[in-house]
C-alpha cells in the first residue's frame, strides 16, 4: 500500500448544533473517532484537507490522524454531506489496527462489451467484503466481454482481490444481460391521413372552380 495520508485534528471543546455550525464556518469538519476499545473522541479537522482525501482515496480511506501529538490509524467509515453544496458536514472515523480486517462496501464496475444485440444492466452497485485494513480495494471489476442474453453475474462469481473475502450473499445479482426492449413507434393514422387528403383535394377543386367562374 502507498504511504498513509496524514491528517491533523483537534479535540472539540464545544458541542451542539450551534458549535458544529461555527466549526463549519471556520472550514472545519466535526468528526467522531471510535472503535477498538477507544473511548469516542469528538474532534474537528480541516475541511479542504479532508475533502481532498475523499476525492483522491474515497470513503474507506485509511489515514494517520494526529490528535494532541498522538497518532491514531483510522478509516473513514461514513460522511454526511450537505445536499446543496456537497461539503462534508460530519465524519465517522473508525479506529483500526494494522493487520486488522474490516467490513467495507466496495463499488462494482463492469468493463467490456456484451455480444451484439445484448444489453448489460447492473443490478447492484456495491458489495460488502472483508479486507485487510491496509489493502482495501477501491473497486471490483467485472468483465462482461462477449456475454450473451440470459447470462448473469452473481456476487459469488466475482474475483476477490488479495486476501479479501465476500460478505454479501453469494446469490446477490450484480450483472444481468438482457434483450433490449424495442422502442414503440407511433402508429400512422392512415384513415386520418386519407380524410385530410380528401379535404385538401376538395379545397383545391373549389379554388379551381372559383377561378374558372371569374
UniProtKB/Swiss-Prot annotation:
InterPro entries: Rbsml_bL25/Gln-tRNA_synth_N, Ribosomal_bL25/Gln-tRNA_synth, Ribosomal_bL25_b-dom, Ribosomal_bL25_C, Ribosomal_bL25_long, Ribosomal_L25_dom, Ribosomal_uL5_bac-type. Keywords: Ribonucleoprotein, Ribosomal protein, RNA-binding, rRNA-binding. Residues 178-214 are annotated as: Disordered. It holds the Pfam family Ribosomal_L25p. GO terms for biological process: translation. One of its GO terms (cellular component) is cytosolic large ribosomal subunit. Residues 179-214 have a biased composition (Acidic residues). Transmembrane segments: none annotated. Part of the 50S ribosomal subunit; part of the 5S rRNA/L5/L18/L25 subcomplex. Contacts the 5S rRNA. Binds to the 5S rRNA independently of L5 and L18. This is one of the proteins that binds to the 5S RNA in the ribosome where it forms part of the central protuberance. PANTHER family: RIBOSOMAL PROTEIN L25/GLN-TRNA SYNTHETASE, ANTI-CODON-BINDING DOMAIN-CONTAINING PROTEIN, RIBOSOMAL PROTEIN L25_GLN-TRNA SYNTHETASE, ANTI-CODON-BINDING DOMAIN-CONTAINING PROTEIN. Belongs to the bacterial ribosomal protein bL25 family. CTC subfamily. This is Large ribosomal subunit protein bL25. It comes from Corynebacterium jeikeium (strain K411). The lineage of its organism: Bacteria, Bacillati, Actinomycetota, Actinomycetes, Mycobacteriales.
